[in-house]
Amino acid sequence: CGRGSSGHAAAEMEMRFMRIGVDIDSLLDNDLIRMRTIFQTKESLVFGISISGETEDVLYLLRESHKRGAKTVLITAKYDDTLYEFCTEVVQIPSLQHLNQGHVISPQFPILLILDIIYSSYNELDRQTKESLHHNTLQALADGWAKTGKKEKNHDY
């Protein structure tokens, strides 16, 4: 989950992992973020993304999910030992001054880099199965486009 640029990165993460068979949701809406805490269990892995490390809804989800036994990971530019009270892991990303305002470098850049590393590492586990799933999602899209008579869309899936 995440808000703003962090939320957009979460949506990108959902799209990529969903295509290789991971049951994943990205949450960008404050109310949905809070409601989803109820469904977290010890079987859950919850990622929160907040460049500032201070987005209250993201921290709420991580805190409450942790209380329910879920593994929790925060991706942030903030270093604060107290985050480990409710985060199984804290992945610190580089931050430039004013990065969260997106004037010079997209705030998503360091987040997407970390997500690419996580995705690549996960994808290496049983790579053949994941490549097959990815291919099957491409085929499902192509079949849908063929049925509707639409030309294939240019997406970077």
Language-model regions, residue ranges each:
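Glycine-rich phosphate-binding loops that contact phosphosugars or nucleotide phosphates
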Residues: 1-113, 119-127
